Amino acid sequence: MAKAKFERTKPHVNIGTIGHIDHGKTTLTAAITKVLHDAYPDLNEATPFDNIDKAPEERQRGITISIAHVEYQTEARHYAHVDCPGHADYIKNMITGAAQMDGAILVVAATDGPMPQTKEHVLLARQVGVPYIVVALNKADMVDDEEIMELVELEVRELLSEYEFPGDDLPVVRVSALKALEGDAQWTQSVLDLMKAVDESIPEPERDVDKPFLMPIEDVFTITGRGTVVTGRIERGVLKVNETVDIIGIKTEKTTTTVTGIEMFRKLLDEGQAGENVGLLLRGIKREDVERGQVIIKPGSVTPHTEFEAQAYILSKDEGGRHTPFFNNYRPQFYFRTTDVTGVVHLPEGTEMVMPGDNTEMRVELIQPVAMEEGLKFAIREGGRTVGAGQVTKIVK
């Protein structure tokens, strides 16, 4: 094997393992790190199974999630990989986006085929916008009958097609994570084949700086003799001095203005970009024209909406959530980016109520418009206390 040297210039991609309990997600994660460590020792450390299985707990918006993070490199790319030990952790992670995925490895045991959680994870992947899936047909060493293997593969492809993934075309790689961990040459190669499929069929994500400019407003100030300054962290894109922007959300009408100055740490800049905390000086805007919770955008790139469908996870009592269920027409606050907006919840037909610890679909009507797109995340709050988290799956109006 030629040695690949560590280059920070390598594309970085976030992936994760999803699939039914005991189909081998964590074993496969460990096997990938071992196989890549053996193939490219300078690039990778092997992470043992126990370190991944005893994942530390993280808190995201008050929700406790056990997530294991490992990293590894192929010759082409640098990967950050998430694996969750429990089924509930997966659901919370996927809905809250605690660890965003550019693509996923769906692990299906060849001995079982698709199971209920396989379906649930694929449905969630579709709903929360995991864009690409590669299938690892695990425990392939335990199935001798080629016909059975082909049937299982067909079943997985049909399931993926049913949820609008390209089931007929996406890669399905037969692996044995356990045998690869034990150092078996044939199955070690299968894991390398899997990573080649991941390299080739999960595209590099668009970088935040390449997306249209958006900055949520956190604060508004007046600077005597200069005008109104809004501050916030640029969520995406690049903004240059003297560019025109729209300010939308919260109020019914949008405001269009020109950015006459960009400051960071009291220094004037020519441009600000994704990830930076900046102050923007706005031409001809009075302090009362803008408020926290609005967003500043590249004109026309995002629109404000009041009604949307969402997938949400409701905190359990142990997580500090509600102690009782809620019903149709529940009216909490929805915290988008930097502010709370009250909304009315409509539950799906046939859902009487939602218990703490459940995940559910819902349709929400907000009392004020919010700049939103599919995939936007929010917290559900009652008087400042987080009781749930979710993301927009479809805009209604």
Swiss-Prot record:
GO CC annotations, alphabetized = cytosol
Q: SUPFAM superfamilies recorded for this chain?
A: EF-Tu/eEF-1alpha/eIF2-gamma C-terminal domain (SSF50465), P-loop containing nucleoside triphosphate hydrolases (SSF52540), Translation proteins (SSF50447)
E.C. number(s) listed in UniProt? 3.6.5.3
Ranges for domain tr-type G: 10-206
Where does this protein hold GTP?
Answer: 19-26, 83-87, 138-141
Q: Which GO terms describe its molecular function?
A: GTP binding; GTPase activity; translation elongation factor activity
User: What reaction gets catalysed by this protein?
Assistant: GTP + H2O = GDP + phosphate + H(+)
Give the keywords, sorted: Cytoplasm, Elongation factor, GTP-binding, Hydrolase, Magnesium, Metal-binding, Nucleotide-binding, Protein biosynthesis
Matching entries from Pfam families are given as: GTP_EFTU (PF00009), GTP_EFTU_D2 (PF03144), GTP_EFTU_D3 (PF03143)
Task: Using the UniProt annotation, give all residue ranges assigned to the region (G5).
Answer: 176-178
Renumbered residue ranges of the record's region G2: 62-66
CDD domains of this UniProt entry?
EF_Tu, EFTU_II, EFTU_III
Region ranges (G1): 19-26
Where does the record place the region G3? 83-86
Task: Write out the residues that bind Mg(2+).
Answer: 26
Instruction: State the compartments where it is located.
Output: Cytoplasm
Region annotation (G4) ranges: 138-141
Fetch the InterPro entries from UniProt: EF-Tu_GTP-bd (IPR041709), EF-Tu_GTPase (IPR050055), EFTu-like_2 (IPR004161), EFTU_2 (IPR033720), G_TR_CS (IPR031157), P-loop_NTPase (IPR027417), Small_GTP-bd (IPR005225), T_Tr_GTP-bd_dom (IPR000795)
Q: Keyword Translocase on this protein?
A: no
Q: Which family does it belong to?
A: Belongs to the TRAFAC class translation factor GTPase superfamily. Classic translation factor GTPase family. EF-Tu/EF-1A subfamily.
Query: How does this polypeptide assemble, per the annotation?
Result: Monomer.
Which PANTHER family does this chain map to? ELONGATION FACTOR TU, MITOCHONDRIAL, ELONGATION FACTOR TU-RELATED
Q: What does this protein do?
A: GTP hydrolase that promotes the GTP-dependent binding of aminoacyl-tRNA to the A-site of ribosomes during protein biosynthesis.
Q: What is this protein called?
A: Elongation factor Tu-1
